[in-house]
Amino acid sequence: MQITDVLIKPILTEKTYGIMMSEPRKYTFLVNAKANKNYIKQAFKAIYGVTPIAVNTKIKKPARVRTGTQNPGYSRLEKIAIITVPFGVEVAITGEKPEPKEESSSKK
């Protein structure tokens, strides 16, 4: 498995945006099911240039889905990684550059 095949895509939902905006920042990715935490950490560092503090993983097991036939189908097995980066570090996972925070100096 190559280092570029580890991180498949970021997971962007309301829940993950809430986690992303807190300190320390945590980013959620769909990863290759065969990747371990060390591979995930190396891939994140190679792609984004930031060494993660921690990597937590969870496996979403296949669930039964309705197919409209007698035989049930199953969803795919997915592995999800929650990657924690150091304080003050911001990563642009959507392709946009992070905007610098502006302090409001206009007090009345």
UniProtKB/Swiss-Prot annotation:
GO terms for molecular function: rRNA binding; structural constituent of ribosome. It holds the Pfam family Ribosomal_L23. The keyword Zinc does not apply. One of the early assembly proteins it binds 23S rRNA. One of the proteins that surrounds the polypeptide exit tunnel on the outside of the ribosome. Forms the main docking site for trigger factor binding to the ribosome. NCBIfam families: PRK05738.3-3 (NF004367). Part of the 50S ribosomal subunit. Contacts protein L29, and trigger factor when it is bound to the ribosome. Belongs to the universal ribosomal protein uL23 family. This is Large ribosomal subunit protein uL23. It comes from Mycoplasmoides gallisepticum (strain R(low / passage 15 / clone 2)) (Mycoplasma gallisepticum).
